[in-house]
């Protein structure tokens, strides 16, 4: 099932830098992580859904690029974010 508007709003509230912040790398990575986790559950039941798998790979790539950007500009913020999200590295 897709990430709902309420779930997105909760993620934004949890990871925003300031009130009204929806575009910071932290928020974008957190939203992508929520969608990636949702799709990972989808693939447990729909193993042959290769079309959606391509979308998943695009999301993972976009998240990786955003994390690389964040690591270059704010290492402390990067480390905090991957720890909070439970990502490896």
UniProtKB/Swiss-Prot annotation:
Ribonucleoprotein listed as a keyword: yes
Gene Ontology CC terms, in alphabetical order: cytosolic small ribosomal subunit
Keywords, alphabetical: Ribonucleoprotein, Ribosomal protein, RNA-binding, rRNA-binding
GO term, biological process aspect, one: translation
GO molecular function: rRNA binding; structural constituent of ribosome
SUPFAM superfamilies in UniProt: S15/NS1 RNA-binding domain (SSF47060)
InterPro entries: Ribosomal_uS15, Ribosomal_uS15_bac-type, uS15_NS1_RNA-bd_sf
Function field: One of the primary rRNA binding proteins, it binds directly to 16S rRNA where it helps nucleate assembly of the platform of the 30S subunit by binding and bridging several RNA helices of the 16S rRNA.
Subunit-level organization: Part of the 30S ribosomal subunit. Forms a bridge to the 50S subunit in the 70S ribosome, contacting the 23S rRNA.
Annotated family: Belongs to the universal ribosomal protein uS15 family.
Protein name, UniProt field: Small ribosomal subunit protein uS15
Organism: Nitrosospira multiformis (strain ATCC 25196 / NCIMB 11849 / C 71)
């Amino acid at each position: 099932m897709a990430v709902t508007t309420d779930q997105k709003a909760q993620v934004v509230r949890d990871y925003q830098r300031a009130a009204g912040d929806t575009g910071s790398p932290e928020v974008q990575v957190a939203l992508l992580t929520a969608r990636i986790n949702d799709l990972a559950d989808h693939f447990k039941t729909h193993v042959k859904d290769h079309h959606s798998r391509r979308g998943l790979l695009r999301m993972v790539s976009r998240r990786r690029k955003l994390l690389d950007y964040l690591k270059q500009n704010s290492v402390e913020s990067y480390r905090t974010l991957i720890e909070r999200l439970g990502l490896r590295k």
